[in-house]
Swiss-Prot record:
It is an enzyme of class 3 (hydrolase). The keyword Magnesium does not apply. This is GTP cyclohydrolase 1. It comes from the Bacteria.
Amino acid sequence: MNKVDKEKIQHAVREILEAIGEDPDREGLIETPNRVARMYEEIFSGLSEEPRDHLKVLFADEKHEELVLVKDIPFYSCCEHHLVPFFGKAHIAYLPKGGRLTGLSKLARVIDTLAKRPQLQERITKNAADIIMEELQPYGVLVVVEAEHMCMTMRGVKKPGSKTVTSAVRGIFEKDIASRAEAMSLITMK
């Protein structure tokens, strides 16, 4: 797994400050390279974790085979194209098979681990669905992610408040429209 090289980050941040015409030794900026290095170590900590490891503990003795939904999971990530934040909520629904349940917090941890790396929203959505499908082997998985991207808010098109919504469906949710509709209605229910 990756280890953050804080010294390299500090050097690079100093160079960026100089490249934009700033004095990295002035008051207010002198500690910025160190602060940015510590911040990157934190916000990219998912690079040193395997998201599927969070799903290794199962409650296989349970006989629950009805829909499980964890919704409004807050997350933040960093767009790999511009290295600016995007943030929002993830919703995960799965239909357990054979009583293979995981702790609810484990689903949130999968999202956190995927989000804490240079990332694309589409990849978080797809990878979360694939990992849950592979590890829990449910009848189906549905993942919906909605986020605001600072690369659309702060620069370029400058559309603050716009949201991007992505979804990934696996298993029964691909074919059974009623099951998919039930999960989606529960996600949108206030």
